[in-house]
């Protein structure tokens, strides 16, 4: 999947345009714009998480980004790389790696809230109230796997990680901590999505 800033911008612009068109065409009867606005907000929240996450982790292990994310050709041969340039690239990577996760989570929440026999739809305020919890779940899981990575508990995932530890290459404790944080972000996001869908279903059933 191409995570270029252009694609992110186009995706958000399309959703925003659809929302505006819905309001223009239907006026007060417009309803779909709320869905598009909700998706845009979910994408924005995910990107904020990704940017903050990578601003922190690029300071824990510049090696993870320089070597692991293959930024050497962009940042140049200076070791360690210029902190400012690294920070800029971390913003790009963080936003690009998370926007689609926000879109997916927002979409599954809307699907879970679609009209059905299980109960009345929840107002969008109830859906929005789940976003901080989703954010918190993701952070907790990311931090947990970050600690696991630091303690080499994730080295079994790849022989390359075992080699890093054995050769003491690229400050391996820090490198693996950042790997764990990033892995935990995706695992946490998936768990948070499951929580969101199940809680929406449960709340809809209880309202019957």
Give, region by region, the residue ranges found by the protein language model:
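Alpha-helical transmembrane segments of multi-pass membrane proteins
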Residues: 7, 19-22, 47-60
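Perimembrane loop-to-helix junctions flanking transmembrane segments
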Residues: 64-86
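Hydrophobic alpha-helical transmembrane segments
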Residues: 6, 80-103, 169-192
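Cytoplasmic juxtamembrane regions at transmembrane-helix boundaries
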Residues: 24-34, 106-134, 198-208
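Hydrophobic alpha-helical membrane-insertion segments
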Residues: 41-55, 129-152
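Juxtamembrane non-transmembrane "cap" segments at the membrane-aqueous interface
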Residues: 64-68, 143-166
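Hydrophobic cores of alpha-helical transmembrane segments in multi-pass inner/ER membrane proteins
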Residues: 9-20, 99-109, 183-198
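Hydrophobic core of alpha-helical transmembrane segments in multi-pass integral membrane proteins
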Residues: 9-22, 136-147
